[in-house]
């Protein structure tokens, strides 16, 4: 009756555990961490993958048997800051490097609540103009549970349900080092500099062939 996003591992695990009947409706799309890691492993055999971000749930995800060989290390921003402080590394003394803006603006927006649903809406509008897309999103596990309860009543039949375990989305993860609102403002600035305005135009779409080639050999468990 609906489809739920799978990019937040904490959300998808909660949904399948507390609402087992909804498991078939959770997208089979792999999380950004796993997908990026697997693509890089195929493009650069022998490389090591380190995920660095605000999400603590990525540690549990990376420990899964089906993911271990793809993601070698997971660090939160808080842990990384601690490592730099232990080595007396002062960021203010490090020369700036030009930022790389390879993702589309909606792709960058994935990190904030509502961003995944928005990206899907924009892609569908580009590919099939005029097609109605019904979406709803929840942030924080309390809201996520409420959204699923409403879905159980049939309120969201035909909807895309976006769930983010952390209020505010990934930018407000347990391993962040700054207030979520500041992160959101910086994220909006980053989005404004993105070279592509629609995910369908992203340069990364050329790697879809790699995904299709190995689709059947990839463990579906890792996609949740």
Predicted regions and their residues:
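Iron-sulfur-associated redox domains of electron-transfer enzymes in respiratory
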Residues: 1-224
């Amino acid at each position: 009756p609906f489809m739920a996003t799978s990019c937040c591992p904490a959300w998808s695990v909660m949904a399948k555990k507390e609402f087992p009947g909804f498991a078939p409706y959770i997208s089979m799309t792999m999380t950004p961490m796993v997908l990026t890691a697997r693509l890089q492993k195929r493009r650069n055999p022998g490389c090591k993958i380190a995920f660095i971000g605000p999400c603590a749930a990525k540690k549990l995800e990376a420990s899964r048997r089906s993911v271990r060989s793809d993601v070698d290390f997971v660090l939160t921003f808080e842990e990384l800051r601690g490592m730099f402080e232990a080595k007396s590394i002062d960021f203010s003394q490090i020369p700036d490097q030009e930022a790389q803006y390879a993702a589309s603006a909606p792709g960058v927006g994935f990190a904030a609540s509502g961003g995944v649903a928005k990206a899907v809406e924009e892609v569908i509008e580009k590919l099939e103009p005029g097609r109605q897309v019904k979406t709803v999103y929840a942030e924080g596990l309390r809201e996520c549970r409420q959204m699923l309860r409403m879905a159980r009543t049939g309120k969201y039949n035909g909807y895309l349900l976006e769930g983010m375990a952390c209020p505010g989305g990934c930018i407000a993860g347990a391993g962040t080092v700054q207030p979520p609102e500041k992160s959101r403002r910086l994220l909006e600035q980053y989005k404004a500099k993105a070279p592509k305005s629609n995910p369908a135009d992203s340069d990364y779409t050329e790697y879809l062939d790699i995904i299709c080639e190995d689709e059947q050999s990839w463990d579906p468990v890792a996609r949740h």
